[in-house]
Amino acid sequence: MAALTVIGVGSRLRGDDAIGPLLIDALSDQTHSQIELVDAGSDALGIIEYFQGRDHVIVVDACQMGRDAGCIEEIDPTQIDLVIKDDPVSLHGLGLAEAIKMAESLQMFPEDLKIIGIEPESIQFNGSLSVPVQRALKKAVKIVHTELNRVKQLAEA
């Protein structure tokens, strides 16, 4: 099994919301046998199945955090209280926060779970990332590689 699982969440049809799946695309261009890549699309709840049996997981999604577009926040779900929002127009069905809470209640958390949230500029129906989120995509790829190196060092220790 791969040392690290990276799960991208988001709709490719909603501008910057596509950041998760597009990160998976970018990483698949740099094929690495120690990274398992999962494009979860807009099914945030479906990520729970990829938590089982994995020790190190990163989830990447567009997150409206009130920051500048393209801002990247590494979120440790055990250190913050994820707020569950009632969003009647969410394309994710149940959102990422709900999926995290459900995994926690089902005791299906991986040993090491990180969430990378990227502030979107626009999640309107269009086909392209905004310039700030394009820049964030490149940074997020580097974050994943840094995390893989950390996981490999842990395995060697």
Predicted segments with their positions:
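Short, internal active-site loops enriched in acidic
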Residues: 120-122
